[in-house]
Structures are given as C-alpha cells and as structure tokens.
C-alpha cells in the first residue's frame, strides 16, 4: 500500500509486509537486499528491461518490526503517476492491496501492540491539538498498557489467594482466608480504578474539543460574540431580533483548547413557527453542552427571559457574559464584561484557557484512559469489584465471591484487546488509512 499521501511530493513510500516480501521485491530491484535488518539499499525498480524509478529500499527482518513480520518500504519519487506505476508493478508481480489499517492490525494480531496502543495510533493520526497528540503518543508508548497490567496483577493476586484456599483446603501451611482479610487489598484496588476513571472523565474534551453553546435572548450579541471568537463573519449580525433562526457552528483554537462553537437562536416566546423550532433546538443543546456561554445585554435592564435563562442554566458549566460594555452597564448581575462588537473578549478567552487547562495531565505520567470504550470497561471492572467487596463486607464465603472478581478481570483484559471480538477490530482498523 502507499503509506504517504497521494499528492505530488519529494518522496512516496510504498509499504509491503509478509513472509518472503524481501525476496519478492528483490525480483524487480537492481540493488542488493541481502543485508541485515534496518538497512537501506539504492537501485532501480525494473519491469523487465525497463527502469521504472530510481529508489531507496528499507528492509526489516524478523519479528521485531512494526507488523511483527518481514517488511519492505520502497522510497520512490513522489509524483502521483510514478508512485502508482511502482504500486501497479508490485500488484502485477503478485502482491495484493492492503486493507484499511491492515499493517496495524497485523501488528496487533502478532502481539507487537495491544488494542489500547492501536487506538492510540489512530488518535495520534487524527489529533488536532498538542495535548491530544501528547496523550496519544503516551498511549503508543504503553502508558495505558502498563497501568492496566498493574491493575490486572493486583486483581489476580486476590483471585489466586481465594483459588488456593478453595482447591487445597487440606494444606496446613496455607492460612485460612476470610473475607475480612481480602477487604484491604480489594478496597485499595477499587480506589485505584476509581481514581483513573475520575482523571479520565475529561479526555473527550482534549480529543474532540469542548462543545460550547452560546445562548441568550434575541439581539443580545450572540452572533457578534461568535464572529469575534471565530474572527470571521460566520453569523449574520443585524439589529433585527430573531435573525438567527437555527444553529450556526464553527471551531476555534485557544492554545491547545479546541472550542466547537454553536450559536443558537435567540430564546424568547414567538409565534413564528420556524423561529420557534430554533428556540426549541437551542434549549435542547444547553443540556448537551460541555460549556454554556450565557449572553446578557448589559445596556438594558434584566428581563424575565434573562432570568429564566439564568435559572435554566444554573448548575451547568456556564459563563455569564455581560455584553455591550462599550455602551455602559445598567445591570448588577455577576459575570464577565465584554464588548463582542468591539472584540473586547480577552478576559473571556483567558477564563476559558484557565478553566480547561489539562497540561497537568498531558505533561505528566498521569494514568488516564483514552476513549469511551476503555472508560466503560474500567467502569464495569470497578462495578464487579465493588459487588465482590460488598459481599466480603456481608460475610459471604470467599468461594462465592470469586465469580465477580473474575468478571472484573475479564473487563480489564478487554481494555487491552486480550479477548477482542472480530467486529470490534473491524470497526477500529477501518478508520485507518490503507497504508497504516
């Protein structure tokens, strides 16, 4: 497969993997590939007597390659035509096109990476900010692998203690095990799991961005705020109330924070059916948002619609903005004073940067999970362990507790893909490009 972009460039890389692939490429390469692993050879790709391209070829032998099998990478000139010509020759000689993510899938199946590392590769490719890239790289390096293995080891020690007592009760040198003796280690392990879950709850904000909804009654400056944040005229700005009848979206980057902005229709009572639908949609988006920006017009007294909106968003993660500060302020509601029309929003931007600063996690060896699949499995592991702990506290015999402990252990194994289902692998690797 072509592992680089199919665009004109200095170099294109064609990747081949599988037993015998080095000898296969040697059959139409003029250079010498009879060298040790991780070496580069110069020569020409030839089709019979015709020279097709001048290339450098990297070879990787043995099981210590990315895929866990022999690999070849042909570095040819980066023209689209010449790259396709070399690829076509490889196919004519007997190779087949790789499927999406097949190289990474082979790496997983051959034990070179586990499922969490495969997911991290996908995350690094799609990362849209530095913090997401750092987290993904840690995943590739085995950060998740290591702490999940530690949890598994702690859990299997507890299970082993129980199994030994069940299978060999007649041995006098084996101390009789009671639920009371199992409790301290089990409770400590549950705390480790719950701490990881607590640290992982905001990972989707780093990877996917912060869903940010701008709400307020009509003509308070919501669209002006969106345009000021986006630094472009994305929303229509007029003095006519109800101009924005549906949602308007855009994304902005504040350092390493990505805000997925949604400007909603002004919230008010209206007879206009189309505007009413927009208002209804605005209200539904409030509950789904990670951050709600409530915009008030500071140049006019607070009205019933403002109060209703403040009550509606109380308890949510919100920032109250007093807009039109350039016209003077006649309300005493607590909030950040801005002038969206004049682009005076620096205090708001700094507030968001401070609130969503994840550097303590991304710049450390903090134990965090990368996605919802992993979080759900660790939640299940913690829940099963908690059932076992409750049984211990109730004095239930240890041989009846071990089933829940095994359930917890199986969920930990699934995080690393040790018993991954085929459809899960298909779903993951089809997200990869063909050459990865």
Task: Label each PLM-derived region with a short phrase.
Residues 111, 219, 263:
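Conserved G/P- and acidic residue-centered "switch" motifs that form tight phosphate/ATP-binding loops
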Residues 261, 295, 321:
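Generic enzyme active-site microenvironment
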Residues 9-11, 38-40, 288-292, 315-318, ...:
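Short glycine-/polar-rich loops that comprise or flank the Walker A/P-loop
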Residues 275-299:
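Inter-motif core of Ras-like GTPase G domains
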Residues 1-2, 6, 130-253, 270-272, ...:
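C-terminal-of-GTPase-core extension/linker across diverse P-loop GTPases
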Residues 230, 265-266, 290, 297, ...:
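Short glycine-/small-residue-rich Rossmann-like dinucleotide-binding loops
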Residues 42-61, 242-270, 288-291:
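Switch I (G2) and immediately adjacent beta-strands of P-loop GTPase domains
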Residues 1-134, 138, 142:
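A glycine-rich (often HGG/GG-containing) alpha/beta subdomain
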């Amino acid at each position: 497969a072509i592992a680089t972009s199919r665009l004109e460039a200095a170099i294109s890389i064609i990747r081949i993997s599988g037993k015998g692939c080095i000898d296969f490429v040697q059959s139409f390469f003029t250079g010498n590939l009879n060298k040790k692993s991780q070496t580069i050879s110069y020569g020409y790709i030839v089709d019979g007597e015709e020279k097709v391209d001048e290339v450098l070829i990297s070879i990787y032998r043995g099981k210590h390659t990315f895929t866990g099998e022999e690999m070849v990478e042909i570095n040819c000139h980066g023209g689209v035509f010449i790259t396709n010509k070399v690829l076509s020759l490889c196919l004519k000689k007997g190779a087949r096109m790789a499927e999406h993510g097949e190289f990474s899938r082979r790496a997983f199946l051959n034990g070179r990476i586990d499922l969490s590392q495969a997911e991290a590769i996908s995350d690094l490719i799609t990362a849209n900010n530095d913090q997401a890239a750092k987290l993904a790289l840690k995943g590739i390096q085995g950060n998740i692998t290591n702490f999940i293995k530690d949890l598994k080891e702690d859990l299997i020690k507890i299970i082993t203690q129980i199994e030994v007592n069940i299978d060999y009760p007649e041995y006098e040198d084996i101390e009789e095990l009671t639920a009371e003796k199992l409790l301290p280690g089990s409770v400590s392990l549950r705390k480790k799991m719950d701490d990881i879950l607590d640290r992982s709850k905001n990972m989707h904000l780093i990877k996917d961005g912060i869903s940010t909804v701008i709400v307020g009654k009509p003509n308070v400056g919501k669209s002006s705020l969106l345009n000021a944040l986006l630094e472009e005229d994305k929303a229509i700005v007029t003095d006519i109330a109800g101009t924005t009848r549906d949602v308007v979206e855009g994304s902005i980057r504040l350092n390493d924070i990505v805000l997925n902005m949604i400007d909603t229709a002004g919230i008010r009572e209206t007879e206009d059916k189309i505007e009413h639908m927009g208002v209804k949609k605005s209200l539904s988006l409030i509950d789904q948002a990670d951050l709600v920006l409530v915009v008030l017009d500071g140049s006019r007294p607070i009205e019933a619609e403002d109060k209703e909106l403040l009550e509606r968003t109380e308890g949510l993660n919100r920032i109250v903005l007093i807009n039109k500060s350039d016209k003077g302020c006649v309300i005493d509601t607590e909030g950040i004073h801005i002038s969206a029309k004049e682009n005076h929003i620096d205090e708001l931007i700094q507030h968001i940067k401070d609130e969503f600063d994840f550097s303590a996690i991304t710049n450390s060896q903090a134990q965090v999970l990368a996605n919802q699949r992993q979080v759900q499995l660790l939640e299940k592991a913690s829940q099963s362990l908690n059932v076992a702990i409750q049984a211990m506290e109730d004095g239930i015999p240890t041989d009846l507790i071990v089933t829940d402990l095994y359930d917890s252990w199986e969920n930990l194994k699934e995080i690393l893909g040790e018993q991954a289902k085929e459809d899960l692998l298909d779903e993951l690797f089809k997200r990869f490009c063909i050459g990865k």
